[in-house]
């Protein structure tokens, strides 16, 4: 039986724009074989939507709690959604 897939929306706030955060997300998501996207939000946060197995998404979440060297993560929220299957790769959206 195949492992169940999930969709998660992760919102990270703090000093997370202009510090390479989206590229950090991209690199880690690809390493974890996740699909979805990450993008800057107008309020200064970074939104990530990821699909994959739960342990993969949780591993990404744990990496995003720390972030890249010049980031200052103040808060991170995760919201679990139903798997959509709409993504075939992981990308940075503008």
Regions found by a protein language model. Name each.
Residues 1-94:
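Intrinsically disordered, low-complexity, mixed-charge
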């Amino acid at each position: 039986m195949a492992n169940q897939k999930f969709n998660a929306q992760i919102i990270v706030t703090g000093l997370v724009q202009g510090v390479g955060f989206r590229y950090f997300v991209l690199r880690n998501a690809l390493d974890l074989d996740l699909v979805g996207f990450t993008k800057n939000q107008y309020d200064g946060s970074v939104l990530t939507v990821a699909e994959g197995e739960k342990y993969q998404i949780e591993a990404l979440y744990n990496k995003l709690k720390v972030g890249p060297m010049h980031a200052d993560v103040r808060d991170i929220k995760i919201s679990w959604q139903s798997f959509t299957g709409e993504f075939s790769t992981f990308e940075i959206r503008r």
